[in-house]
């Protein structure tokens, strides 16, 4: 009996000695991952660096030169909940993902649509907003245009922001049209207002807002978006802790109604227009 007990104890100790190193190694790996998370960088710095680009009503300047918009509210609330301040890094849209990858900022909160191509390069959170792609057209140039087929002709000129999802959608769905791309939405819109392009392809709700703002010049050829999309925060790959935190933050702000309230204010009302620069 005593020999059997001794044998069992020996086997238990042997098994324990085999298990402890892997457990210790796993714990060490977890500690290293946590220490390497951008969350730790943000906390030590005391600031959340956010990459963004101006895009009404996501982000824009007010009459005092300060940034306002849906994304700005989201980033400020996120930083507040983390106990840090928000720092915004305005970036050209076609270079915003490369800038994230080189560490110019911690994440992108900038109306960035989730696409498979982008997701191969960066990680996306769950959607915190949903928008669509629509166009606003010049009344003189696009008289009678009501479908995508009406615009799908070589003599038709479309304007869009360079590198943005609407430009990609225009290439795919209206391939015969001539597409001109601009660094800013305002420049693309101006091309249509000046009668140099038939339509401006962009994300909702901009087309409807601009049609209301310029009723003598612009109209909505199609009342509904022709592509639906979803926007998420983008962050560098290999950071599961940060992805988990941001996903849960979005979930909680959806559950308490804060994201919807802010989204409705910026996307379904024009109460903010007096604050924005024309």
Give the location of each predicted region.
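Ligand-binding cleft/hinge of the Venus flytrap
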Residues: 60-64, 75-84, 147-152, 166-183, ...
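Alpha-to-beta junction loops
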Residues: 48-49, 84-85, 102-110, 155-157, ...
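A ligand-binding cleft/hinge motif common to bilobed small-molecule-binding domains
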Residues: 95, 112-121, 169-172, 193-194, ...
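Short helix-initiation/N-cap motifs at beta->coil->alpha
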Residues: 35, 72, 88-98, 143, ...
């Amino acid at each position: 009996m005593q020999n059997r007990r001794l044998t069992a104890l020996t086997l238990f100790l042997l098994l324990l000695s085999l298990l402890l190193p892997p457990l210790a190694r796993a714990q060490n790996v977890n500690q290293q991952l946590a220490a390497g998370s951008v969350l730790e960088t943000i906390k030590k710095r005391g600031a959340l660096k956010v990459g963004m680009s101006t895009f009404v009503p996501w982000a824009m300047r007010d009459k005092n030169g300060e940034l306002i918009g849906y994304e700005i509210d989201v980033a400020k609330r996120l930083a507040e909940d983390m106990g840090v301040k928000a720092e915004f890094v305005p970036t050209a849209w076609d270079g915003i993902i490369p800038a994230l990858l080189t560490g110019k900022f911690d994440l992108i909160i900038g109306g960035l649509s989730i696409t498979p191509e982008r997701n191969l390069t960066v990680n996306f959170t769950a959607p915190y907003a949903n928008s669509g792609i629509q166009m606003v057209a010049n009344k003189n140039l696009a008289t009678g245009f009501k479908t995508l087929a009406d615009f799908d002709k070589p003599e038709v000129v479309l304007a869009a922001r360079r590198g943005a999802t609407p430009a990609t959608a225009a290439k795919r769905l209206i391939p015969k049209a001539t597409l001109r791309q601009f660094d800013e939405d305002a420049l693309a819109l101006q091309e249509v207002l000046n009668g140099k392009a038939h339509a401006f392809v962009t994300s909702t709700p901009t087309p409807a807002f601009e049609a209301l703002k310029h009723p003598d010049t612009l109209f909505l050829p199609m009342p509904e978006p022709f592509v639906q999309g979803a926007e998420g925060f983008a962050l560098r790959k290999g950071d599961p802790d940060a992805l988990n935190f941001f996903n849960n933050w979005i979930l909680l702000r959806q559950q308490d109604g804060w994201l919807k309230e802010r989204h409705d204010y910026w996307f379904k009302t024009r109460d903010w227009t007096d604050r924005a620069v024309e």
